[in-house]
Amino acid sequence: MRRAARASAPGKVIIVGEHFVVRGSLAIVAAIGRRLRVTVRSGGKGIVLESSMLGRHSAPLPGQGAAAKVSPVLEPYIAVLRSLAARGYSVVPHTILVESGIPPRAGLGSSAASMVAYALSYSAMHGDPLSAEDLYSVAMEGEKIAHGKPSGVDVTIAVRGGVLAYRRGENPVDIRPGLTGVTLLVADTGVERRTRDVVEHVLSIADALGEASTYIYRAADLIAREALHAIEKGDAERLGLIMNAAQGLLSSLGASSLEIETLVYRMRSAGALGAKLTGAGWGGCVIGLFKEGEVERGLESVVESSSQAFTASIAEEGARLEEF
């Protein structure tokens, strides 16, 4: 066994399909150039997490010592560790160092990237890096603790990278983007929320609507298919219209908020071809599709209403091991 190993995974934006993917609709998701890195070092006592964003947390190793209350921040990592142990990896004391360029709790997949990078680095420390299939399965155990009923799309894109068409229970399909001359603007509302709470709220509204909600989900699925074709054909104008329609559907099920709508309309007023929330909603981030020559105006338009904003490129590479 090595003394340490390091791995990273990309963040993501959901172009269309968040929430609806939970009940079988299509989602289009893209990895972005911002990455999260995890370094695992053996030694010490128990399991220790060190993160500039999440602080320092520690706990006994699973199955060792008296039962102790574990920080909610550590619980997903422990779930991943248990899954690794079930696959034959030895459980040893170690420290997890997290370095992230992905804002946490913002809908950009930081949680999934962290679970993926942790699972890959821990398995690599033992000299046997997980395969992509096993990496997905192990990381999902952590996401279930973090989010309750994750669709799996965040973990999939963190493992694979690129742009994917994703439907729950089916193999993801790689999309070859034909878009040129456009870029994504990402603006953070600065409002933190628990993904699990938003997912449960949206599902409760869908259930309350009864049969009517089936038409909303059907429309979301059709919109996602149109988005796939627009991306492949390079039709940015059409993709923008589709993003706007998707925002309306998400709002109808209670996923939006005043902060989100403010950023959406500021981007549209600044020339965005389309703008919508990405991720769970109730806060987190908004994405806007801009022509490259107009994105600076978009950045200026969201300065006062966002905690941070940046342009995002598509990351072709998913999870990877890294040298020290």
Swiss-Prot record:
Its cofactor is Mg(2+). ATP binds at residues 103-113. Its EC number is 2.7.1.36. It is an enzyme of class 2 (transferase). Catalyzes the phosphorylation of (R)-mevalonate (MVA) to (R)-mevalonate 5-phosphate (MVAP). Functions in the mevalonate (MVA) pathway leading to isopentenyl diphosphate (IPP), a key precursor for the biosynthesis of isoprenoid compounds such as archaeal membrane lipids. This is Mevalonate kinase. Disulfide bonds: none annotated. Belongs to the GHMP kinase family. Mevalonate kinase subfamily. It catalyses: (R)-mevalonate + ATP = (R)-5-phosphomevalonate + ADP + H(+). SUPFAM superfamilies: GHMP Kinase, C-terminal domain (SSF55060), Ribosomal protein S5 domain 2-like (SSF54211). GO terms for biological process: isopentenyl diphosphate biosynthetic process, mevalonate pathway. PANTHER family: MEVALONATE KINASE (PTHR43290:SF2). The active site is at 154 (proton acceptor). It is found in: Cytoplasm. It comes from Aeropyrum pernix (strain ATCC 700893 / DSM 11879 / JCM 9820 / NBRC 100138 / K1). The keyword Nucleotide-binding applies. Homodimer. HAMAP family: Mevalonate_kinase. GO terms for cellular component: cytosol. It holds the Pfam family GHMP_kinases_C. Pathway: Isoprenoid biosynthesis; isopentenyl diphosphate biosynthesis via mevalonate pathway; isopentenyl diphosphate from (R)-mevalonate: step 1/3. InterPro entries: GHMP_kinase_C_dom (IPR013750), GHMP_kinase_C_sf (IPR036554), GHMP_kinase_N_dom (IPR006204), Mev_gal_kin (IPR006205), Mevalonate_kinase_arc (IPR022937), Ribosomal_Su5_D2-typ_SF (IPR020568), Ribsml_uS5_D2-typ_fold_subgr (IPR014721). One of its GO terms (molecular function) is mevalonate kinase activity.
